Structure formats: C-alpha cells, structure tokens
Amino acid sequence: MKRSEFYFDLPEELIAQEPLEDRASSRLMILDRRTGEIKHDIFKNITKYLKEGDCLVLNDTKVIPARLIGQREDSGGKVELLLLRRTSMNEWEVLVKPGKRAKVGKRVVFGNGELVAEIIDTTEAGGRIARFYYDGVFEEVLDRLGEMPVPPYIKKKLKDKNRYQTVYAKYEGSAAAPTAGLHFTEELLDEIRNMGVKTVFITLHVGLGTFRPVKEEIIENHKMHEEFYIVTEEAAKAINEARKNGGRIIAVGTTSTRTLETVADESGYIHPKSGWTDIFIYPGYKFKAIDGMITNFHLPESTLIMMVSAFAGKENIMRAYKVAIENKYRFFSFGDAMLII
C-alpha cells in the first residue's frame, strides 16, 4: 500500500494553534464505520452516543516538560535537548539540536548550573544518551527548567502547561499528550460514569516518534517506534468483564488503541502486561480488542491516519476528512474530535 494514498490537502488555517477555553466544547464528528454515515455534534454531547455497559479506555500518562534549552559548557553555545525516554535512573535517550557538535564527553548546562547533561553515547536512530547531574528530585528540577514539547506544527507558545495534559493524567513519562483525552472534563467523565459506562485507565508513554513522518512510499516498509505501556490486572479484568457482558470497548485515542491491540489475544481477551510495543496498524489489520475509537483529526500520510483508516475503512476516513475540511473542523493536537463506532 502506498503512502500517497493517505495524502490530503489541508488548509493551514485549520491547524489548531491553541486549545479551546472549554475542553468539552470542541466539535465532534460521529462516523459509522459500517455505513459511512456522518453526524456532527459537540464533544460534551458524546453521552448521546454511549450506552450503559460500554467501557471507555483512557491513557493516564502525563506529559513531562521534556524540552530543555541550555548552553555548551565549553563554548557557551545554545543547545536544545529533547528527552525521549529514560534508560536508567539518571540517563535518558535524547535528541540534541544542533546534533553535530553533541559528541560523547560534551556537557550542557541548564539554568544556573542546577542541571548538567553529559553526552555518554550515541543511538542508531541518531539520538544521544545523556547522563544528568543535579541535586534533589529530577522531576522537580525538570518542572522548573523544562518546557512542554508541543508538536512542530504548533507555532504559538503554550500559555498554560496544564492544557497539554488530560484532566486524568497521572504517570509521568510522555513527550507528547494523548490528545483525544484532552476533550474530557471531570464533569463530563462523571456524567459518563453516572450513565453506567465504565472508565478504565491504562498507561502508554507517548514518544516523539508519534510525529515522525513515514518516509517509505510502500508503508509496509515503515519501521514503527517503540513506546512503553502498562495494563494492570485491574484494568484487564474490567475490560474483559465489560466485553463479556455485551458492552462495547471504546478506546480513547490511538495510544489506548495501540496498547489494547498489543495485549489482546486473537479472541479479544485482554492480558495484564507491561513492556514495549512497536505495533504498526494500517489497512488490512484485523482488530481484536476495540469496538469504537475517539480520536482527533490527524496529519496527512501519518501512521495515525493509517491506523484510523484500518479501523473505519480508508474510503470512509478520506471522505470524512474531506467533509471535516469543508465544515472547517480544527485539526491535530488541539483540534476537534471524531467518534468512530
């Protein structure tokens, strides 16, 4: 299958540059994947499309302020570090800009010297391994010195760090938000629970690989990035019970979908597990775990539009995106939402 089959022309003004004041006031497109029928609504009305016994699966990862701006210890030159994933207690895989001078042994100083990174190794993907030196708790130092690593297509500076977190974010480790969850408020989640819908939390730490473009024209040749996930016994049991009782399993976001499809067996039974997943879902994939998906509108030719095309059918998705553009839906991380059922 060709990458170009997932291309569409998106007017730049439809790329949402900041979140709406009220999370749940985003627009919601409802797509019936069997008939291709499209409806339009507002996210806070999502309860109209849920039923008692359904199970919403949400990703409770928390974005860390993973973008650090510092100076080279030897020359004072500006350096940007992006934390990708922790490899041990004080060591992280990082991206460095400019990368050419980030040789092993070089040190970068942040703030008033309260955080120092030493480059100790290189990675196959062109990144670096950095060892950090600091006093106190790393997360607290990072919170003071780091910035939220918003995606490259968002040009505006984020006014409030919390707007790039879901209201239920709990476990730190992501370099990007699971954006489908940004539409939920505490009040809406309570309303959903009160109607007899289960909410179950799993964890997948989103890596920046989620924004990595597909360079291969034949998509089957694309190598997917790895992300760390955790599905607890409690979560697996709740999801399996909901399915056994006839409820629909609705994944909130592509990250929850990736996780569930990784831990499900052929019958759709969810196993409690943790580990790294590099699952790449594109048309032809047979879904085992989910009956519905809540997701944002994704980039052309991205692995994410390939995943939703696998779930809803490529023709349905490309037509729905055409309708979204005609109706001026907002796209990408801070944009509007789609419910596929």
Curated annotation (Swiss-Prot):
It comes from the Bacteria. Pfam families: Queuosine_synth (PF02547). Keywords: Cytoplasm, Queuosine biosynthesis, S-adenosyl-L-methionine, Transferase. Its EC number is 2.4.99.17. GO terms for biological process: queuosine biosynthetic process; tRNA wobble guanine modification. Pathway: tRNA modification; tRNA-queuosine biosynthesis. It is found in: Cytoplasm. It catalyses: 7-aminomethyl-7-carbaguanosine(34) in tRNA + S-adenosyl-L-methionine = epoxyqueuosine(34) in tRNA + adenine + L-methionine + 2 H(+). Its main location: cytoplasm. GO terms for cellular component: cytoplasm. One of its GO terms (molecular function) is S-adenosylmethionine:tRNA ribosyltransferase-isomerase activity. The keyword Isomerase does not apply. Monomer. NCBIfam families: PRK00147.1, queA. Transfers and isomerizes the ribose moiety from AdoMet to the 7-aminomethyl group of 7-deazaguanine (preQ1-tRNA) to give epoxyqueuosine (oQ-tRNA). Belongs to the QueA family. This is S-adenosylmethionine:tRNA ribosyltransferase-isomerase. The lineage of its organism: Bacteria, Bacillati, Bacillota, Clostridia, Thermoanaerobacterales. The gene is queA.
